[in-house]
Amino acid sequence: MSDSAEKVKKIVVEHLGVEADKVTEEASFIDDLGADSLDIVELVMAFEEEFGVEIPDDAAEKIATVKDAIDYIEANKG
């Protein structure tokens, strides 16, 4: 697992208060991890801060799973 993937999973655990073993790459933030729209906004902000990437609203709307977040970050980080 990449360093980015580990950091994404850590952020998800901290922000959503879920067990680490539930945070799989296939896990949907809303359907599997119980996030609501405010949680998603907070996660996006945390990802932006941690990785130094900007995630525009149209891109954030397409990030539905943990893998989506990892893929976006790895494709766009400096």
Curated annotation (Swiss-Prot):
Post-translational note: 4'-phosphopantetheine is transferred from CoA to a specific serine of apo-ACP by AcpS. This modification is essential for activity because fatty acids are bound in thioester linkage to the sulfhydryl of the prosthetic group.
Pathway of action: Lipid metabolism; fatty acid biosynthesis
Annotated PROSITE patterns: CARRIER, PHOSPHOPANTETHEINE
Pfam families from the UniProt entry: PP-binding (PF00550)
Ranges of residues in domain Carrier: 2-77
GO molecular function: acyl binding; acyl carrier activity
Keywords: Cytoplasm, Fatty acid biosynthesis, Fatty acid metabolism, Lipid biosynthesis, Lipid metabolism, Phosphopantetheine, Phosphoprotein
Modified residues (O-(pantetheine 4'-phosphoryl)serine): S37
GO (cellular component) term, any one: cytosol
PANTHER family: ACYL CARRIER PROTEIN, CARRIER DOMAIN-CONTAINING PROTEIN
Biological role: Carrier of the growing fatty acid chain in fatty acid biosynthesis.
Name of the featured protein: Acyl carrier protein
Organism ancestry: Bacteria, Pseudomonadati, Pseudomonadota, Alphaproteobacteria, Sphingomonadales
